[in-house]
């Protein structure tokens, strides 16, 4: 029978509920338990697929093709368990489900209300499909007091009564700010946050208190007294140097012990944290460092590239080097020479993106990397721009472009109109909806034997996650290969180009998929490990 941990947040947003949930999941997993993590998002979008990357951050894609919140990336990286579309739900999805049911007559003429219909939909989502797990950790998005989060709070309150006694625990993540003028940490914001949570009928079992310095014992006792939790259940969550320190830090503070005690599991099996200690040791004691330029379109919000950033650091862990990131807005290269920006870097990465803005700058970055023999990693849009660069400057395809940018006589990159997913033919048109209409999720690819990328994978058969509407036009394949660009990977039916490379370049690889989504600190993705290895070699030349 599954036990449930509900994680809420108070005082301010962006406290790190996702990291806290993921770290707790990793700790329980290290004790041998089977763990599932789920995210409940209060926004009215059906999913984040059409939301601006500079507002919402990264859209994390699962194997089964769901466009989800970036916190699911944290869940996967910390636990190694691949999430599914049933691990994330939004208010928009819930209301859509309810309205669809109402239109079908499923409610038999009843007046559809927030209670019980919305709350029941939320509860059904939380508890279904959990028979194979020991613990289900549910993160509630937003902050206590938000209007949008009210149905979720009511639903998890009801679940505290619906579930068998002793199978639900509430963890409240809060902030204890330091006031320089007073020279002390303040408990009042946490007190008020807990008071508001209690007014909703939820009594936290554990307080996880964020702070930038040690919380004095007297202040912990004060929180225990005023927030009605055991002194041992006031857990300090101090700032750490990197997020992979969090599981060990929380274990030292006793979070996992306290959660298990709240469930009455004593004595609990000891956690095996050796792999996490090795990761943290490699991060703390690098044997070198490299600088990677990320030439992107959404550099104003680094969360737009969250999995990418982490995957690069995973590559650093694999090579025992520190990875420094140089962020460059791609539009800069449309006005300025890229050389002064890129001459000193050890690798260039052009990530995914949408739309014409900044595309020429990415093409210039690809040309610089090709001509100067700097390691280049093009992901999704970054691969497409590298192919357009080759078409223009190597294959003499004047006007080579993408139909994403408008009509063109040389559509080197074009809209995918149809492809096969499973046994079903998927069809799209330029006039179709944007939401949920891309080539999404895991697809297989066949790599050409003897290519650099097949050597990196150690296989010619791979499966990676995709999120794109446009694809390199296979009609240009022969012309490009005659100029030295190798199409090293194709879809199994040979229709869709998946990877490209230059055999005479130290490391120039483009992939249509998103390998960053499958990288883990305990299991770095081979492409990122190889890219950072190549950058390390480049650092000895610069």
Curated annotation (Swiss-Prot):
Gene Ontology terms, MF aspect: ATP binding; CTP synthase activity; glutaminase activity; identical protein binding; metal ion binding
Metabolic or biological pathway: Pyrimidine metabolism; CTP biosynthesis via de novo pathway; CTP from UDP: step 2/2
Quaternary state and interactors: Homotetramer.
Mechanisms controlling activity: Allosterically activated by GTP, when glutamine is the substrate; GTP has no effect on the reaction when ammonia is the substrate. The allosteric effector GTP functions by stabilizing the protein conformation that binds the tetrahedral intermediate(s) formed during glutamine hydrolysis. Inhibited by the product CTP, via allosteric rather than competitive inhibition.
EC number(s) recorded for this UniProt protein: 6.3.4.2
Sites where the protein binds ATP: 14-19, 71
Residue ranges annotated for the Glutamine amidotransferase type-1 domain, each copy included: 291-541
Keyword Metal-binding part of the UniProt annotation: yes
Keywords linked to the UniProt accession: ATP-binding, Glutamine amidotransferase, Ligase, Magnesium, Metal-binding, Nucleotide-binding, Pyrimidine biosynthesis
Pfam families: CTP_synth_N, GATase
Residues reported to bind L-glutamine: 353, 381-384, 404, 469
Positions that bind Mg(2+): 71, 139
GO cellular component: cytosol
Chain sites annotated for binding CTP: 13, 146-148, 186-191, 222
Gene3D superfamilies: 3.40.50.880, P-loop containing nucleotide triphosphate hydrolases
Function as written in the Swiss-Prot or TrEMBL entry: Catalyzes the ATP-dependent amination of UTP to CTP with either L-glutamine or ammonia as the source of nitrogen. Regulates intracellular CTP levels through interactions with the four ribonucleotide triphosphates.
Name under which the protein is recorded: CTP synthase
Claim: Metal-binding is one of the keywords in the record: yes
GO biological process: 'de novo' CTP biosynthetic process; pyrimidine nucleobase biosynthetic process
UniProt family annotation: Belongs to the CTP synthase family.
